[in-house]
Amino acid sequence: MKKILIDSGPLIALFDASDKYHHDAVNFIKTNKYPLVTTLASITETLYLLDFNRNAQIDFLEWVHRGAVELQHIGNNDFGRLKELTEKYRDLPMDFADSCLVYLAEKLNLNTIATIDRDFTIYRIQGRRKFKIILS
């Protein structure tokens, strides 16, 4: 079954009604038919950027707890590739959450991502394949 990677941007927008992408994020979640996949790095980034509103953080945690997103583990053995990606895209610069998502795309053979981050137009999966971006 097809899965869609999801970055922190749409997750933040989903739980922050004042975010300019809020309506787009809500519409995407309502109409999306595919499982969403992310990493703990993106979850952490989302919670950090929602720190202005404890209720939004709690709602987000409940949403994740209910299984709205599938969390993929990044282990010690994966850090070699994360380092390579971070070095390759150091001029952007690539943050840890983004490197985890690019790595996950490689690991799970996925290329569709829900993001508002323009850097994903530059990142390549295994150095070649472009991401299909939703919500940019």
Residue ranges and their predicted role:
Residues 14-15, 114, 124:
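Activation segment
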Residues 1-19:
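Metal-dependent nucleic-acid phosphoesterase active-site entry motif
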Residues 7-8, 39, 116:
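A secondary-structure boundary/capping signal
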Residues 2-4, 23-93, 103, 107-111, ...:
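PIN-domain endoribonuclease scaffold, especially VapC-family toxins
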Residues 117-121:
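Low-complexity, intrinsically disordered Gly/Pro/Thr-rich segments
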